[in-house]
A protein has these predicted regions:
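A short, proline-enriched helix->beta-strand linker immediately N-terminal to the Walker B motif
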Residues: 166-170
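Conserved ABC transporter NBD signature motif
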Residues: 60-74
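ABC ATPase "signature
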Residues: 231-232
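Short coil-to-helix segment of the ABC ATPase nucleotide-binding domain corresponding to the Q-loop/switch region
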Residues: 106-114
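Conserved ABC ATPase signature
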Residues: 147-151, 155
């Protein structure tokens, strides 16, 4: 039986009077790679931010590795857990954003080592070994001493990916990680994510790169106006869409 890593049940999220997520259900098993596509404003990024607990949500439940995260139900009252528990829950996921968010005063290796030492309390020696391992995995074996300002955008994003996976999360979240890159740098980042997929990393990916989503995903989710409009295998979504809305969306993409 497959090991369930992520279980999203009827998530509702509103900003004021504007409901962004209108009851989303989604499951990922260990090793699954699921891509989320859809127009801007459809709720893709908000869903990822709810999973990572960067956003609070008003209804529903998210479980990672069988444990409810972010909220507790005591005496039938739903309450947000304390900040210490939020930090522990968030550590179950690794998230890579559009912007690289590297510390400019730290080298590539030091950026990766920081959370290993501060959060996981690993020794400097072990943290350095882990950092070097992941720099090699993302194709930057000789750039550990380089600072972010000395790296290209693609290289910085690869360091950001290495920093996230070095923490050994149960689930990786990618939020349009190539959208801030020059076109010629996109493939080097996508190739790193593909290699993680081959290695069995469980991943939920928001992307505008349709060909990449087709090639890397076990399942593709099309979000439309805060709900899952359609989901299926890459062939079902990209070659045989069943809704007019998805067909119209795909006509405006580069797939």
């Amino acid at each position: 039986m497959a090991e369930r890593v992520l279980e999203i049940s009827s998530i509702h999220k509103a900003f004021g009077d504007h409901e962004v997520l209108k009851g989303v259900d989604l499951n990922l098993d260990k090793g699954d790679v699921v891509s989320i596509i859809g127009s801007s404003g459809s709720g893709k990024t908000t869903l990822l931010r709810c999973v990572n607990l960067l956003e609070e949500y008003q209804q529903g439940e998210i479980k990672i590795d069988g444990r409810v995260i972010g909220y507790s139900n005591k005496k039938n009252k739903r309450t947000r857990v304390n900040n210490k528990q939020i930090t522990q829950d968030r550590a179950l996921t690794g998230m890579v954003f559009q912007s690289f968010n590297l510390f400019p005063h730290l080298s590539a290796a030091e950026n990766i080592m920081l959370a290993l030492r501060k959060v996981q309390k690993k020794s400097k020696k072990e943290s350095a070994e882990i950092a070097q391992h992941w720099l090699e995995q993302v194709g930057l074996p000789d750039r550990g001493t380089s600072y972010p300002g000395q790296l290209s955008g693609g290289q910085q994003q690869r360091v950001a990916i290495a920093r996230a996976v070095a923490m050994n999360p149960k689930l990786m979240l990618f939020d349009e990680v190539t959208s801030a890159l020059d076109p010629e740098l996109i493939n080097e980042v996508l190739d790193v994510i593909k290699s993680l997929a081959i290695d069995g990393m469980t991943m939920l990916i928001v992307t505008h790169e349709m060909r990449f989503a087709y090639e890397v995903s076990k399942k593709v989710i099309f979000m439309n106006d805060g709900v899952i409009g359609e989901q299926g295998t890459p062939d079902e979504i990209f070659k045989n869409p069943s809704s007019e809305r998805l067909s119209a969306f795909l006509k405006n993409t580069k797939f």
